Amino acid sequence: MMTGATLCSGIGAPEQAMPWVEWQWCAETEKFPSAVLAARFDHPNLGDITAPDFIDRALSLKPPDLLIAGTPCQSFSIAGLRRSLADDRGNITLRFVEIVNAINPPVVLWENVPGVLNTKDNAFGCFLAGIVGASAPLVPARGRRWSHAGMVDGPKARAAWRILDAQYFGL
């Protein structure tokens, strides 16, 4: 059976959507979503992923085959100030990369808004570089913007992405 864990877990949408996965743990800080997670699922909530000891606590548990995160989108959204990685919330994305590299799960799924593809500081290129093990931020193949779908290879991993619109999936 595939095992999984979630970061920035919210109310547990991945856990609900994929009941065949053996969920090992989650990480959520907000009070209401944490209460929902506790009521619906029996796996531990490791809390704040920015805590200095988070990686050690995660490594002390069974490693997941699948790691899913929906890091905060406000710093990347076109509806916001677009501070990107200059915003603490945007930097949680880079913390996610640190966690991925420490845990090294076979499969990683990251959810965010399309605005992350075209920030002034190339946040998506920084994210991809961290995931695939590149030594510098990656840059889009054509033009100044990342495409809505693509794949990159790096020294440590391969990453693919695609923009999907939830309205077309009955959500």
Predicted regions and their residues:
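Short glycine-/small-residue-rich Rossmann-like dinucleotide-binding loops
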Residues: 72
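Feature marks short, surface-exposed loop/turn motifs that line or immediately flank catalytic pockets
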Residues: 13, 33, 75, 116-117
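Class I S-adenosyl-L-methionine
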Residues: 55-64, 76-171
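N-terminal Rossmann-like NAD(P) cofactor-binding module of classical short-chain dehydrogenase/reductase
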Residues: 5, 66-68, 109
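SAM cofactor-binding core of SAM-dependent methyltransferases
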Residues: 2-53
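Active-site flanking residues adjacent to catalytic metal/cofactor-binding acidic residues
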Residues: 27, 47, 69, 110-111
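Short helix-loop-beta connector
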Residues: 1-2, 62
